[in-house]
């Protein structure tokens, strides 16, 4: 048994009550939209709208993270990725993968390069800084 809900660095609502139930009932989360419609790849930074991107094609349907707070969080997460020399998308996916209540992370690659980047997350190791 599992639950399929959205979960990402920008959408952590699952952690409020549901994560505890997942662990207790051994019913893991299948996290979808782990890259928050592409916002956690960095492709929409500074107002950019790449050709054939979801935001370019479907615009108003995916504005959930285009808020002031959403954009601020995206920039802060991007800074963290850069500081630690991490690929932004991979850091975002790994965050989901490392949660004890997550069974699997559902990816949605459009290109072969995106698929390779996403698969490489399985072989990526994050360590906590020692300071």
Question: How would you describe each model-predicted region?
Answer:
Residues 1-123:
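Beta/alpha (TIM)-barrel catalytic core signal, keyed to glycine-rich beta->alpha loops juxtaposed to Asp/Glu
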Residues 124-130:
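Conserved small/polar residues in nucleotide/adenosyl-binding loops
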């Amino acid at each position: 048994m599992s639950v399929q809900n959205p979960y990402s660095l920008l959408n952590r609502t699952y952690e409020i009550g549901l994560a505890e139930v997942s662990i207790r009932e051994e019913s893991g989360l299948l996290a979808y939209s782990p890259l928050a419609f592409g916002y956690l790849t960095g492709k929409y930074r500074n107002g950019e709208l790449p050709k054939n991107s979801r935001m370019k094609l479907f615009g108003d349907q995916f504005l959930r993270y285009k808020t002031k707070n959403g954009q601020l969080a995206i920039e802060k997460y991007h800074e963290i990725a850069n500081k630690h020399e991490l690929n932004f998308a991979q850091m975002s996916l790994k965050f989901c993968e490392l949660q004890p209540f997550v069974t699997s992370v559902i990816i949605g690659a459009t290109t072969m390069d995106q698929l390779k980047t996403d698969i490489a997350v399985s072989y990526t190791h994050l360590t906590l800084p020692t300071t």
